[in-house]
Amino acid sequence: MSTNPKPAFRRILLKLSGEALMGEEGFGIDPKVLDRMAQEVKELVELGIQVGVVIGGGNLFRGEGLAKAGMNRVVGDHMGMLATVMNGLAMRDALHRAYVNARLMSAIPLKGVCDDYNWAEAISLLKSGRVVIFAAGTGNPFCTTDSAACLRGIEIEAEVVLKGTKVDGVYSADPMKDPDAVKHDVLSYNEVLERELKVMDLAAFTLARDHNMPILVFNMNKPGALRRVIMGEEEGTYIKNLN
């Protein structure tokens, strides 16, 4: 039983990697994983949490390999942005099937497919209890979806960016390779930078730090972990200003 029955956060930005949607598949979207994630988001909405979502596109397209093979980086990034729109459409559909009101906003205009990103409208929708999915990254090449998550989190005045990954927090080393890797429960922004811990790319991380936006890294593949994070239970790694 939770020692903290009230949610720890009122408005969140949930960042999901595209890879998280693959499940056990090597590519694309696993429908079972998609539906489970939609159900977990539904639980938050039922708790009265305002939820914004940013999804990566790595399950459908990775631009780095093609860029190394000679493709123009801007073209590759545009393709990656469109991959995030495809994931966003899938998530919106899964939420609608779970009877959750959701809107998809894209940083690139896609008339007839989804809404254009509008900051004021997004906040209004969140206040009305709708889940808002932000697609197409920031709309600019050379910016990761982690940067988009931090940017949108700051814009919608979220209390935290929740980064759902394949591991249950931030470790001193890669836990997949180093059996002696130690998990951190709480870190300051400076500790992450000084120890060169892999949380997200530097541009995204410094954006969060400069705007005092806490980041909580947790394992989205672990059933119930998202709810535990929201309820303030010990789950994942919490990165914030400790001064």
Swiss-Prot record:
Pathway: Pyrimidine metabolism; CTP biosynthesis via de novo pathway; UDP from UMP (UMPK route): step 1/1. It catalyses: UMP + ATP = UDP + ADP. GO terms for molecular function: ATP binding; UMP kinase activity. Allosterically activated by GTP. Inhibited by UTP. The keyword Ligase does not apply. HAMAP family: PyrH_B. Homohexamer. This is Uridylate kinase. It comes from Shewanella denitrificans (strain OS217 / ATCC BAA-1090 / DSM 15013).
